[in-house]
From Swiss-Prot:
The modification N6-(pyridoxal phosphate)lysine is found at K265. Belongs to the class-II pyridoxal-phosphate-dependent aminotransferase family. GO terms for biological process: biosynthetic process; L-threonine catabolic process to glycine. Substrate binds at H159, R389. The modification N6-succinyllysine is found at K45, K187, K326, K368, K383. One of its GO terms (cellular component) is mitochondrion. It comes from Bos taurus. This is 2-amino-3-ketobutyrate coenzyme A ligase, mitochondrial.
Length: 419
């Protein structure tokens, strides 16, 4: 009888195991097919391994010798600034590696509140709220703020995190053509029937280096009773006279309602994001923003690094001026050599090449010459608009800039991108 039960159990288990194995095999087949389609489309993203700290000069696994890095968001060079590193170490030692908690349980330390207050002062806003990343700040904002009675109007080339955040909310969604103020006005007219109208835009767009026309956006928002939201991830710390961002650059700091930005680019490059704006909005986000409520607090070391980075910025704008001068040096030399550089005078300098294979080949040959840049093609950018995105840092030397231009000219001629 015992043997019969064992046999019955074994027989009943066999079909279940077979079905499980069949489901796993099906999953593997689906995944391999999807991965192969990515490879076939030429959009596979490989990850080069850096074996040194981040900075203008790095070591890359598989590349001989030192490499000059021109593809980091390290606009001010603060990720390796000795005072920023020391601040992170001090905070780590005093406040520990992490909080093991969300903010509203036992995850708020004095350093979190101090940094939020410092961010609000920096942007001249009432209050600020920290998130693990700006992606979280963007996915948390719209759902918490907007209801089905409201409308959000978004630039078509906004960052993926803004797009995802808008998808999560119940507001009516309008998309206007990139930087097209006539189209935005038409959409604002159409959205007049809604309770709140929020215009959402990047301050500086990461693929093209162009800047949102905030003066015109704010004028239209005022005319049609709308609020203005700006993501300043590629502007905070270095655009504007004191690095406050595109709203300072364009003289509309008092007209932009909400700013989201990051601590993971110019402000030390560790991690973290934030929303800053009206105090009542920040209070609402603390109660309703899901990425804030259900994510661990920002680690103390990251808080310490970002706080010191802001101190350095508020003490002097010398590094901001240095980055601007080096950006101008690169752009002017590249244009004089015959390259087309997209965007305004922004440290994101897209070298427009058009052909995806050409962009990939030039980037590979640049690395062989000790210059680390990345090529971008469809679907990251439109078809026929492939480019190499060069990013300038305040800690690049003039010699670094000149060497990069020389390599571009040499490789460009080799591949027929220059005569």
């Amino acid at each position: 009888m015992w043997a019969g039960r064992v046999l019955h159990a074994a027989l009943s288990r066999a079909p279940r195991e077979s079905r499980a194995q069949s489901a796993l095999a099906q999953l593997r087949g689906i995944l391999e097919e999807e991965l192969e389609s990515i490879r076939g489309a030429g959009t596979w993203k490989s990850e080069r391994v850096i074996t040194s700290r981040q900075g203008p000069h790095i070591h890359v696994d598989g590349a001989p010798g030192g490499i000059i890095n021109f593809c980091a968001n390290n606009y001010l060079g603060l990720s390796s600034h000795p005072e920023v590193i020391q601040a992170g170490l001090r905070t780590l030692k005093e406040f520990g590696a992490g909080l093991s908690s969300v903010r509203f349980i036992c995850g708020t330390q004095s350093i979190h509140k101090d940094l939020e207050a410092k961010i609000a002062r920096f942007h001249q806003r009432e209050d600020a709220i920290l998130y693990p990343s700006c992606f979280d700040a963007n996915t948390g904002l719209f759902e918490a703020l907007l209801t089905s009675e409201d409308a959000v109007l978004s630039d078509e080339l906004n960052h993926a995190s803004i797009i995802d955040g808008i998808r999560l909310c119940k507001a009516h969604k309008y998309r206007y053509r990139h930087l097209d103020m006539a189209d935005l006005e038409a959409k604002l007219q159409e959205a007049q029937k809604h309770r709140l109208r929020l215009v959402a835009t990047d301050g500086a767009f990461s693929m093209d280096g162009d800047i949102a026309p905030l003066q015109e956006i704010c004028r239209l928002a005022s005319q049609y009773g709308a609020l203005v939201f700006v993501d300043e991830s590629h502007a905070t710390g270095f655009l504007g006279a004191t690095g406050r961002g595109t709203d300072e650059l364009l003289g509309v700091m008092d007209q932009v309602t909400i700013i989201n930005s990051t601590l993971g680019k110019a402000l030390g490059g560790a991690s973290g994001g934030y929303t800053t704006g009206p105090g009542a909005l920040v209070s609402l986000l603390r109660q309703r923003a899901r990425p804030y409520l259900f994510s661990n607090s920002l680690p103390p070391a990251a808080v310490g690094c970002a706080s010191k980075a802001l101190d350095l910025l508020m003490e002097s704008n010398a590094i901001v001026q240095s980055m601007a001068a080096k950006t101008l040096r690169f752009r002017s030399q590249m244009e004089a050599a015959g390259f087309t550089i997209s965007g305004a005078n922004h440290p994101i300098c897209p070298v427009m090449l058009g052909d995806a294979r050409l962009a990939l080949n030039i980037a590979d040959d640049m690395l062989k010459r000790g210059i680390f840049v990345i090529g971008f093609s469809y679907p990251v950018v439109p078809k026929g608009k492939a480019r190499i995105r060069v990013q300038i840092s305040a800690v690049h030397s003039e010699e670094d800039i000149d060497r990069c231009v020389e390599a571009f000219v040499e490789v460009g001629r080799l591949h027929g991108a220059l005569p």
